Amino acid sequence: LADEAYDHEVLGEIARLALLEAVPDPEERRPYEASLDHSLPVVDDNADSARVVPSALAHPVATLLGLQDRAVVVDGACASGLLVVDAAARYLHDRTSPFVLAVGAMANMAITGNVSFSKIGGLSETDSTPLDENASGLVPGEGAGAVLLCPLAYALEHGMTVYGVIRGSATRTDGRGRAIYAPNMRGQVSAMRHAMAGGNFAADDIDHIETHATGTKAGDTEELLSVKEIASGRCSGPVSLGSVKSLTWHGFPAAGIANLVKVLLCMQHERFAPVHGVKTPHKLIMENPDIFALHRAPATWPVNDSRPRRALVNAFGFGGVNSSVCIEQFDKQYHANLVRVESDTVLPSGKGRAVAIVATGRCQATAMDNGTLLDDDIDFDWRYFKVPPVLVPHMDGAQRLALEATRRLLAERQIDPDRCGIVLGQPAGLEVLARRSFKIRLPEVVSALRSTQSVDSRDIEAVVAGVENIASSIPATVEASLPGYMDNIVAGRLANVFDVRGPSMVLDAGEASFAASVDLAARYLDAGECDQMIVGSAFASRSRVHRAAGLASQGRNASVMLVRSLEWARKHPEEVLAVVEVKTVSEVENDRGFSSSANAGWVLETMATPQNDSGWSEQTT
């Protein structure tokens, strides 16, 4: 798969860079390169190289199904499996698309991630036992799941099979808090409450909560405290708790989809599934029998005479990202009545999505094209951001550039933390990941070099020593290493430092990533979920993989914008720098009657500019 291929590709690339430094002479280097080619092959041809960038993960699915417009990778770390559902729902709310396919996939369980995760004490030495008092950590798992979404009215009109009805979904961020990977009640409670608000539901309206619970002590405890706050005051008895990870293990970006599918199956079979592996329930469950019910054997899911079965499904991720979905079992009569009641609340259809730019911030690396993947040459004001200097090398350059650009952005404008979100659009695959993989997987590189034929063993060991010396300049893997190379943490750092509490995510749509971020941000604004959104892109990779895919031609920089809705802009024209509209390529072709060589992607147009004292004009420029 694309992510796994990318991880292996950049390892091969950085190994060759280290060899180049250790053995400058091309003739002497040639036999060692042959050994690396055999053990750590890299893709030579540009077309193939473009297929291993992470954004390529979505394209085979789109091609298989004949989808023309949008194929986007959504990254919210372990919240991704429900974040993608929440994001997908935005494309249904304004009737842009009759269907949206949301997929969660995990199939790149590489050693780099496992070693890094172990440094924060997250891995179990035994088994996955979420919600158990003695749970010792998570067990990584792989898998994929998909749900096809469409408007309820459309499904009823066309007699489609409906497995469940999403009444609300939300993604909320912790904002300023503890470590970037520490769970936080504030964001978790906010996500669940916002999801419940989609149906105006109270605590007694929820039968079951499918927890994110991974089996880590800190994570399970914080989530149970969050659920306790949501469920306290129930009059209808305790809420059922579930976790599927003792069966599937932790699928990271696929975990949320696994939770959702499990709940749909439970509704279909009208039963609560047991939480396997629990010997001693978590002490918060034991101490609050009036709030929590943990099923250790299958149990009947009682039916409520006045409403369908209903559940909350959670997925939380590093970077303080918390996604929650409120779903209920399909009942034809109940939901037909619901469609009639809510038919007037659907947002009007519109082709283009427009946002008003009210502030901008930009930061460019001082050394544009110098150096290689082995070099870390991006300056960072660690004193201002209160980051210990020893941790700076573990933060990817994109994270540092994004922080500085956003500092400049917010020097111009203030934000309301609760009403602001972040959507960054940028190619995935951070440069520091290559260095981290090289450091951790050095034995693979050394083994390949020692397999070199027709060279004196003493010469081989000298080359090995040279490569090992280069690797020694890379900091050892520590607690801070994992978030330092996670793509979604580029947005997560901004939320944590600047106290942003709305949705937070990174989108990868290749060259169209920035336009994709504007497109989705406009939907959150139009739906009234946020008043302000930070959009933009931060990119600092010099990898040949990104160059071959045409993604590294603009140097290393970060550009961010604070955007607001068009409705707000009409009331405050004096504060608007410009208004931009984003459309898909096919929409532009239909509007203007021409054909483009592009078969997918977005088009950004400036449709308004300031007009001296008279405000702003809606003339397309």
Where on the chain are the PLM-derived regions?
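Condensing-enzyme catalytic core of the thiolase-fold
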Residues: 1-621
